[in-house]
Amino acid sequence: LSFGNEVHCTCPLDKGDGSVVRSIDPYGHLLTTTYGDDAVWQLPEMDFSQTHWYGDGSQRDCVTTIVNIHRHHLERYRKPFLLGEFGIDWRTSDLTYDPKGNALHWHNGIWASLMSGGMGTACVWYWDNYIDRLNLWHHFRPVAEFVRLVGKAWLQNWRPLKHTDPVADVLSHEQQFGDFVFTPTLGWQRPTGDTFVLHRNGKVESDGETSVFLFSPSKPDLYRPPKFIVDFPQDGVMAIQVGTVSSGSVLIVRIDGKEVWRQGLPEGAERKDEQGRTYREGSYREKRWVEQWRKWDYVYDREFVVPVPKGKHTIEVDNQGADWCTVTQIRFSPYRDLKFPEVDIVGIQTETAALIWVHNQQSNFQNEREREQGIRGELKPIKGLRFEVLGLKDGKYSIVLWDTWKGAITAKWQAQCRQGKLLLRLPDLQRDFALWITSR
């Protein structure tokens, strides 16, 4: 039972409601709400914490965001967590982006949530005009069968998975570098961190999370621009993916404290439309009038590229405009050492078991759309993928490989854990698969 839907509830209200419901409910419904803050979720009346998350259609995937949302709520409030709603774009159905029903965003979201320790899979909102219309119900079977396979083991005291950096086979013995894609994970809120150290193995070390909304000083309670500590192996670029600009933004990049790039958005002159509303011309894809706020949103969905010299630098990304814009990702290139593959390893473990979801980051809904449009090549498998699970008790373990699309076991083998390290050598990774590891 949820006391509210996307309402920022106050602590006294929820405490009072919880006591009343407990006294009259003979069935013992679990109690929650959306949205809640620290005071709300720490109430004993709240059986589990919950939130909703939607993108704006310009993000490439949802995995990192969903994993971070789960980890934040589970670690902070120490009670079960459910992502009660999620989707590609808060303004429209997933059908708009996935008319053929490949279900990649949804698929990745439910597996990322389950294997992050969620009390259930993340819940998609668009049942009628997406799931039912395209008859996507069969995607539930593989995850349901996997839950059944694990059985009562779900009731163990799980903790986040610890593992070494994954490595994979490379075509050349020479060191090669590719894209490092940084993805903001928060929605409409003040960032919890502002400093991000980017390691060439693909890891991010930070003091918190930043928002997809790059707020300007016009919202002082939300304004906290990010800075990145980088070490470029050679001269390269930082490419800022701008989604939507609200009214107007001025993006600024500073390298080691010196401004090196500035871009006003929209870029053009003022004009009036047929209704006399003032707007600006620019290189945006489209403009949308938001009647509620009497303002224009300008949809760009494009990269703005800033050169970065070789070596160690501190890069600040700021917005000094009239209002916010969304930055859905920032690409640093060449930066990431290619011996470290672009994979997500999401999981939970005990001392004698582990549940792991392994995901090829190139398997996402945006890349799939580009393949359908003929502007991106076929998805290539990652070969020779291997990493070690850390913190298991020494001994022999059984490993089950699960096909997350067909809902079947595709391989079984055994491996020895020595000195708390269990080496996993995995088959070619095309899209994703799951692992169920148990001691013998």
Residue ranges of model-derived segments:
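Short, surface-exposed amphipathic charged segments that create phosphate/polyanion-binding patches used
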Residues: 49, 277-281
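Active-site-adjacent structural elements in folded domains
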Residues: 299
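Generic detector of short alpha-helix boundary/capping microenvironments
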Residues: 37, 72, 101, 105, ...
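Aromatic- and carboxylate-lined catalytic core of secreted/periplasmic carbohydrate-active enzymes
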Residues: 78, 90-91, 108-239, 246, ...
